[in-house]
Amino acid sequence: MANITAQMVKELRESTGAGMMDCKKALQEAEGNMEKAVDLLREKGLSKAAKKAGRVAAEGLVAIEMNDDNTVASMVEVNSETDFVAKNEDFKVFVKDAACMALATDKEDIASLLGETHKEGITLQEVLNNRVAKIGEKLDFRRFAKVVTNGQVAGYIHGGGKIGVLVEMETEARDAKVLELGKDVAMQVAAMNPKYVSRDEVDAEYIAHETEVLTQQALNEGKPANIVEKMVKGRLEKELKEVCLLEQTFVKNPDITVKQLVADVAKAVGSDIKVVKVVRFEVGEGIQKREENFAEEVAKQLK
């Protein structure tokens, strides 16, 4: 039997909202596999949220830069150890500079981008090293994304740089309404974090996995086998409307879907508009901050 630690139980509880004993039992049944334990809790109706195991804990900033005609955009995430440093002006300037360099570069990986020359006359990596020495805290240029399109691209920053979203739209229109639409869609993505743009992108593996979980969930609820299939179909349909961007209810107007919003703007500008890609960065996504017991920390300082 796998060794189930208190930390594993704590992580599963935080990611699902289930009770401590339920989390422990699920981990034991899943032999320590965190994702399988999440599925088991969902099947039993004990998970309050279909979150994946793991939590967001790192600090830092996301920044976006865009060219003048909204056909090229870049987005970067740079992490710091504390929120205090994330609010430091030197740190903010570095993140903005990194986004500007990402916008101008043809490089596709961080290592190559860090090797490019900064406006200070040294490499971006050397500038980063200097900031680390000045600020006195570890900084990490974690990732960047770039969108280049013949259509239009819009961006949105939420929470002062905690979440950033880029939205690529396929369209011939050059109208302020299109950019406003792009920002509205980006806000939707920031708030609702959809897995897919449209139902066409949903892969068969996801459908099979969710069908299995929902079927087991219905059976565990004691539903008759003859109506389980119908129930699963209905629940899966509801879930797809939640994970597919275009089928989501628009957060600024719950009377319409995002798909209807896009269609309305397309009609208003007299040109087809298709949302083809979204990129969403959330600061610290998937990174777990190091935690120490306060008593242990004090003990270390006394040694």
Curated annotation (Swiss-Prot):
Task: List UniProt keywords, sorted A-Z.
Answer: Cytoplasm, Elongation factor, Protein biosynthesis
Q: Which Pfam families match?
A: EF_TS (PF00889)
Q: Which PROSITE patterns match?
A: EF_TS_1, EF_TS_2
Map out region (Involved in Mg(2+) ion dislocation from EF-Tu) in residue numbers. Answer: 82-85
The record's subcellular location field reads:
Cytoplasm
The answer, when asked if Glycoprotein is one of the entry's keywords, is no
Q: Name one GO cellular component term.
A: cytoplasm
Q: Which PANTHER family match?
A: ELONGATION FACTOR TS (PTHR11741), ELONGATION FACTOR TS, MITOCHONDRIAL (PTHR11741:SF0)
Q: What family is reported?
A: Belongs to the EF-Ts family.
Q: HAMAP family attached here?
A: EF_Ts
Quote the protein name from its UniProt record: Elongation factor Ts
**Record organism:** Clostridioides difficile (strain 630) (Peptoclostridium difficile)
